[in-house]
């Protein structure tokens, strides 16, 4: 695993934990927009974990998830990504996988590119969620990569 990819995954976990800390301190845990978008994020993370592990991605409809369930799923997802990443060497990172939700033409990407996609997809929607928190009167956190570096690469803390 490259050091940059490891850093992206570590930042990804920290930034998500910071988002949940901000959301958890707010009075808007029940906001349907936040719950729906955060549910989408973790569903995509779980789908990529399945694909990267050689399993089929789940496609069933789920009810709007609750805050506590979402936080638990995110934490589990990040633990799984960290475990997966520890076992990846150069050949594993270069292996091609097929992203099934883009069927025609087939979307083939390397494991490395899939991991970057997970981080960037989450970053995009996490930014939307932070903006939503602010619009609802909560206090979002600045989770820029540079801030994570400046703070000496802290680990994500999932406890409230």
Regions found by a protein language model. Name each.
Residues 2-6, 67:
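Active-site rim elements
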Residues 56-100:
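Helix-adjacent hinge/juxtasegments
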Residues 6-62, 102-160:
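Short, contiguous alpha-helical
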């Amino acid at each position: 695993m490259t050091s940059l990819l490891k850093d992206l995954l570590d930042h990804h976990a920290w930034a998500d934990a910071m988002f949940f800390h901000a959301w958890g301190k707010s009075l808007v845990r029940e906001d349907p927009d936040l719950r729906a978008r955060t549910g989408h994020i973790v569903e995509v993370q779980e789908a990529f974990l399945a694909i990267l592990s050689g399993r089929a991605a789940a496609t069933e409809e789920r009810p709007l998830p609750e805050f506590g369930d979402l936080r638990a799923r995110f934490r589990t997802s990040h633990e799984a990504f960290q475990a997966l990443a520890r076992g990846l060497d150069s050949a594993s990172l270069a292996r091609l996988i097929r992203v099934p939700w883009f069927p025609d033409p087939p979307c083939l990407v390397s494991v490395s590119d899939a991991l970057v996609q997970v981080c960037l997809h989450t970053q995009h929607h996490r930014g939307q969620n932070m903006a939503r928190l602010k619009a609802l009167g909560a206090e979002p956190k600045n989770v820029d990569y540079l801030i994570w570096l400046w703070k000496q690469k802290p680990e994500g803390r999932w406890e409230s």
